[in-house]
Amino acid sequence: PIVRCYAHGFDDPGCSYNRAYASALSGWNQIRPHLPVMVLEYYNVSKFEDLPLLFTHSMAHDFQVYRRTGAAGFVYMHVPLVNWGMRTLTQVLFAELAWDPDADIAKIKAEFLSRRYGAYAGRLRSVYDQIDMASQQITSWRAWKDRSLLSRLQSWNGGRPERPLQVDDHFQTPEAFDTAGEQMLSLLQAALLTLRETLSAVKHDTAAIRTDIVTAVNPAQQRSAQQSAQLRHALEEDLRLLVYGTDTMQLMLRMGQYYTALYAGCDDRAA
């Protein structure tokens, strides 16, 4: 389902993106003699451009649907090669749910955060939750379909538009797009602030541990130094990815707002 919607369940009949996919999967699995059908998801489709997206909100439900409709297997594109950052959670959930669709997502997520961030897991939970919420309408923003905002903007020549900004039926109007975009950006900026503050706290709390110049004299010191280095690496990787994601989504939002301002003749706002 390369242009599926993640704001709604895969089997939601009210979703204009998903209902055709759900119908197709159900139809294929009713063919006799039965043919094994696999699902190819797109948690990192090329149009997402390695953005720091999370799909925890939809994965538990969707894997249940895939099993219920008779899917014989599950893969997805494209598994990131480097700089997984917070997307590491998606890899963990994918592996766990592909093995057991009934797996406890809340438990898996809590264990993941604890192992990755240790004493700072509580802070990062809010970061992950905010990114997850901000990711829900990503298909309306950028997808392999001409009704996504990215496709609309890419076909625009930059001059004064002759018609209002076209948005999909999930946004419905340019005004609703504007509101949803500001909410999305607010979530990402809040997550970014928490992440920066957490990294600063980690640097302060571990200032005495200088693994580059101090040699551990016992196993406890060695473990402490390794854990400190791993934690900072994880947070710095998360930060790089989230800065990129926030900047990218802000640029898309502002371009959409610029289009609307030009169309309305509000040159002062467009400037």
Give residue spans per PLM region.
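Catalytic domains of carbohydrate-active enzymes that cleave complex glycans
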Residues: 41, 69-70, 96-271
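Catalytic-core regions of glycoside hydrolase
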Residues: 1-109, 115-116, 182-185, 189, ...
